[in-house]
């Protein structure tokens, strides 16, 4: 039984509101003694022509209370107390029958969602800031797919632009081929930095770079061969990180993919009478939307990010006919995306309303203990490797005889980092602190993983238990609160989809782990007072482990069975 839906159905029987709307209005009371669900009656004031508190009293008398312990009013709220035995039985049976599918639905069936995320720049470091977009995008992809949406994950590589003309010049002058083979990104970064240093002394280098990029745009064989080499070397490095994170993309169509599609977009904008000359540049004026102009072409005729993003959006709509197109890009780009989406609307593409920018904050280091390859950029691969090493040290201290400890350290160490990126509101900055991230106490990945491993240990010791569980034996506050939380998994997922915020799932699973440990500390499980209680509690542990595993999988985190 879905109690939230039952509350909505009972209210619908006595009002003109639809179930979907009622479910959105239902709240969880701030204090447990106030009930399990609360319905605010403000929405009914116009229909009933009464004060909300009087409506609540009237509904309390009319409503069918079967399945509830009681229904009470608290001012303008109608509060429901569920029948605890029914709820526990329904939730645990549902979790244990649906297993890895528990929490999923078909709400997104038949709807395509494009998720653009990660998108590192070719020949540039894949640094710790990139994990924000990568982790958020991967989690949204998994969450949406879990709810039935057909997701298309796009890694919109930064593989085009005048910087490649500079890199070609730098390569021809200063590359160390041996260093390039050993550390491609490090060497490409070194020569790129050197180009900028030398260009300050010799402005002719900038002209040469522009000419190189012009040749690349025109399809010159020599420049194209170098560009492809830079791209292949970079992707080889990037894929090391994606393999560590277990991430695969459906498309690697980056900026270069749209290079032959931009002229048509510029022409379409011009045909609509939107293109305006501004000091030699071509722009779309957005004054009436309180935004600066959206630049389409620079004064030298070159296209910029906005042109490419317009071309990409139009291509994606034609190719995937998306229900939503999500851009997981840093918050500083918020204005850019507002300009792009508004320009699409002015071009007559009303589907621009289905394009959503998902912003995120910055990553800061709590201290400078993390070594860098060139003094200022922290490579993501180094960060993940260091996390695995630090985790292995902790395992060697706590449980040196653990089987497969290197594999456990890898899952725990990488999972701990990803969990940190997804723990709080995505627009908040992250302060990276090893001590906190790898702690087994508090709101961390290792704490949740430890809770799961603790549960699995109980299940291994319990062995195969026969007979049907009597869930009426789960009568304590801790047991009810844990079961009730498990029943709210789908709500957490739907909130994450509604807000495009994976932290809704992360925060939820932290609460589940806390509730599980409260239950574990308050009650004997394997040494319960009788076999009926033992069986019911073991089933509660099994359901908890299933929900934790499902939730961590949605976040792109592997579970560890033992630690």
From Swiss-Prot:
Cystine crosslinks: none
Which processes are annotated in GO (biological process)?
Answer: arginyl-tRNA aminoacylation
| UniProt motif 'HIGH' region: location | 120-130
Q: What is its EC number?
A: 6.1.1.19
PANTHER family tied to this protein: ARGININE--TRNA LIGASE, CYTOPLASMIC (PTHR11956:SF5), ARGINYL-TRNA SYNTHETASE (PTHR11956)
What is catalysed by this protein?
Answer: tRNA(Arg) + L-arginine + ATP = L-arginyl-tRNA(Arg) + AMP + diphosphate
At the highest ranks, the source species' classification is:
Bacteria, Bacillati, Bacillota, Clostridia, Eubacteriales
Q: List the GO cellular component terms.
A: cytoplasm
Task: Give the record's subunit note.
Answer: Monomer.
Which family is annotated? Belongs to the class-I aminoacyl-tRNA synthetase family.
Name-wise, this protein is Arginine--tRNA ligase
Main EC class the enzyme belongs to: ligase
What is the originating organism of this protein? Answer: Clostridium botulinum (strain Okra / Type B1)
User: Which is one GO molecular function term here?
Assistant: arginine-tRNA ligase activity
